[in-house]
A protein has these predicted regions:
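The feature captures the beta-strand-to-loop junction immediately N-terminal to the Walker
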Residues: 34-36
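ABC ATPase NBD Q-loop/coupling interface
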Residues: 58-84
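Conserved ABC ATPase signature
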Residues: 161-165
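Helix-to-loop junction immediately C-terminal to a conserved catalytic motif
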Residues: 49
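H-loop/switch region of ABC-family ATPase nucleotide-binding domains
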Residues: 221-222
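Catalytic Walker B motif of ABC-type/P-loop ATPase nucleotide-binding domains
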Residues: 186-190
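Conserved ABC ATPase "signature" region
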Residues: 140-157
Length: 237
């Protein structure tokens, strides 16, 4: 699979923030977007996921065949329905207002594009044991929400209200929600904001693990050293 920017011009209110971008990202790659504050990293991510409309150009998804070839007609992200797009691309934005939900309930919202109902404490066990409610089970019989909580190291927070957490803890919850969405393309805007050194390392290890599973991971970050060591491609804005 490929995720590509085709002569993409992005910006605010018709004012371009950069020259046309042409880039192609492959399954299993980590892509770092670097740039000073105000350079347009967040705007670019929002345009990639169609939260903002491009000034010109397209963001495309080319689905691969078993023989490694690509389909002739790619999907254009901005022409997809909201639900279809949410099955292909997820985005982690900087922590904002959080609803009065438990950690488990908020993370389970990532499953809505797949037709799964949000999980509360009363139905998590039921959903894990009933594939008819899930529509799918992951290997090891873990529900995608439970797996996301475990991967992000926050299973012990499942019953806590998100509003009681620190900014760094909320950031990890929102990352778990994006993981639970289980899209082949993940966009992350400064995913290590508010995190200490140990938690930052854990997040970057998780992103490497997800890329090894074949996902395309695109990260807007100020962590230049990490980008130079681990990213397969770097976009400098």
């Amino acid at each position: 699979m490929q995720f590509s920017l085709a002569s993409l011009v992005y910006g605010h209110r018709g004012r371009a923030l950069a020259q046309p971008l042409n880039a192609t990202f492959e399954s299993g790659q980590i892509v770092a977007i670097l740039g000073r504050n105000g350079s347009g990293k967040s705007t670019l991510l929002n345009t990639m996921v169609a939260l903002l409309k491009p000034i010109s150009g397209e963001v495309r998804i080319s689905r691969g065949h078993n023989d490694g070839s690509q389909e002739e007609r790619p999907l254009v992200v901005h022409k997809m329905s909201v639900q279809e797009r949410a099955r292909w691309v997820s985005i982690l934005l900087p922590t904002a207002e959080t609803p009065p939900l438990t950690v488990q309930e908020l993370v389970s919202l990532g499953r809505l594009p797949h037709g799964n109902r949000p999980l509360g404490a009363s139905n998590l066990g039921e959903s894990i044991s009933s594939s008819s409610n899930l529509g799918e089970k992951l290997s090891g019989s873990l529900h995608p929400v439970e797996q996301a909580l475990e991967l992000c190291g926050i299973s012990h927070w499942a019953a806590r209200k998100v509003q009681t957490l620190s900014s760094g803890q909320r950031q990890r919850v929102m990352l778990a929600r994006a993981v639970a969405q289980d899209t082949p393309i993940m966009l992350l805007d400064e995913p290590t904001n508010f995190l200490d050194v140990e938690a930052t390392d854990e997040v970057f290890q998780l992103l490497s693990h997800l890329a090894q599973q074949g996902k395309i991971i695109i990260v807007a970050t100020h962590q230049r050293d990490w980008a130079q060591r681990h990213a397969h491609q770097v976009l400098q804005l």
